[in-house]
Amino acid sequence: MISLEGKVALVTGASRGIGAAVAHSLASHGVHLGLASRSGDDLGIEGAVAAPCDVRRPGDLESLASATAERFGGIDILVANAGVGAYGPFLDLPPDQLEEMIDVNVKGTLYAVRAALPYLLESDGADIVTLASEAGRRGLPYEAVYCASKFAQVGFTRALDHELSEKGVRCTNVCPGGVATDFAMGRGRTPEMPELEGMMTSEDVAEVVLFVLTRPRNHRILETAFRPVAEPSWG
């Protein structure tokens, strides 16, 4: 296990849920933070650089990455967490929700990496962690477009690993199953649905992200998949 003390991380989708849990976890291990969210919330984390940021706008991410690097002297970690979802039969999905999932989940991840990568390449040891999903590993009913967006994230991050591993940048897909967040209660889901029972917490996911980031630099984790005990394993 390596220390993260003094490292610098940029976290997208940082205002709540998994993003906020990851931010607090990293801060507790001495990581300096740049926090991207639509609200611009600094989560009460002392010294954090935070600004209103829409991941669909590359300029927002570039400005925050620049401000973070200027404040702390660089960026060592990107946690690409921002995401949206909608659930239901494909033909019932409103076009604006379809476009939002592609724009936020896919383009937003690409834009975040483009903004952070110049700084990551200057780090002595950098990490890109993509918060994907079990939905990025297998098709799930009534989640066709969400699955498509998550498969795109997984494929992008795996391809990046081939490009960047020899340059000192590790690339990891973190693929949780059900997590009890406001996001889980997304469009088309209701509290009585059985798949919402026994979900993991945001803090559970943050622990996995921390595990990934603290592995010795002589190896890397390409993908980690985990889910609640109550959730089917699907083979």
Q: Where are the model-predicted features located?
A:
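Conserved glycine-rich Rossmann-like NAD(P)H-binding loop of the short-chain dehydrogenase/reductase
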Residues: 29-44
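C-terminal helical subdomain
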Residues: 169, 173-174, 193-234
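Active-site helix of classical SDR
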Residues: 113, 149
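Conserved glycine-rich cofactor-binding loop
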Residues: 8, 15-16
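Substrate-binding pocket helix/loop in short-chain dehydrogenase/reductase
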Residues: 89-90, 97-102
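The beta1-alpha1 cofactor-binding region of Rossmann-like NAD(H)/NADP(H)-dependent oxidoreductases
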Residues: 53-63, 95
